């Protein structure tokens, strides 16, 4: 409700009213993380993401949120290290390789960034992933390559380094 209306403060107030035992439910933690993320409250989002990982370790979303919180707190290497094993745990998720590509580029590991982005293209809709990547400042160093029509053709290269 409140979040869709663009009022994250009211959304947080509503979330504060939730009973303690319900506050650790994955759906509640997901909404709380979204509210904090949209409010740029990354320091507050991190413990919520950690609790979400404990509440729903079998889902990729908590791990993605945890990594994003770390990244937004300028802890990119920690985000990379957290998300890297999740690529194996959730092999069908294109978002995990995409985020790993972003983190690799920010860590100036461009070869890894290329390989992870190509893997994201293979797992997701390659054209949509490419459009998203060309609008993502985290991948700016790869933009000239991504614009090359052959970028998608090269997406059958070897798996990224683990």
Model-assigned labels for residue ranges:
Residues 127-162:
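Terminal, low-structured helical/coil segments at or just beyond the last alpha-helical repeat
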Residues 105-106, 110-128, 153-158:
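TPR/TPR-like (Sel1-like) alpha-helical repeat modules
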Residues 20, 54, 88, 121-122:
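Amphipathic alpha-helical segments of tetratricopeptide repeats
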